[in-house]
């Protein structure tokens, strides 16, 4: 079932167009990734979807609600790239202050969040004394305390170590499985985008491609087979005429449709090669194909 729609939303600051007529459809339980470089318009899009800023034009609906309605904000949780929590009070107070904004908070759920995000031992610490990873875990737990239908994460993994990312995403995946949580995140981390159900590639304020990760890879990414051989001419004679081949530093760089074709080809030329390496196409390949530049 569709949870959120955005129809031709735009944001203009004086003469500068930050977001240009973006359309979105988000289904319940999905993990949606906005992938793009810094300045692409990802955060501005999130800010419009969360009601932090108004659209210049276009329409946003969440379960039939408009961002100007109070009920809209009861259905969402937001974690901004830069924290908005009170640094002068404890972790526990920050979470409780958020909980008081809503009726019928489930204390068992709140305590489970605290446990799952590993916050039990730091509840009495002031927020401004925490490390970056600890702060981010508190930010996300606080945003979830009222059990929203939709969680917005703006660059959630920036500056975090691998272990902290693992804790965060392990907990979020658990909530997706048990409670049907829907997540929209902005990221320039390719690993995060790889896990999404659906990806919107954004550049210069526009959606330049949108589809499942699998389909985007099929359409834009290239699987690369690198071969070293003392008899390159014989190897070249076996290559499918539709494949792209480049000779570089004594190696053959072959773009192949999929790993099965690569395996079949390697079996044919095995006696002729001294070394090979196969690399799957990835999100960086997709972004390079679409924009001509790397995402990092």
Label every model-predicted segment.
Residues 151-154:
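Catalytic Walker B motif of ABC-type/P-loop ATPase nucleotide-binding domains
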Residues 222-296:
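Short, charged/small-residue-rich alpha-helical element at the C-terminal edge
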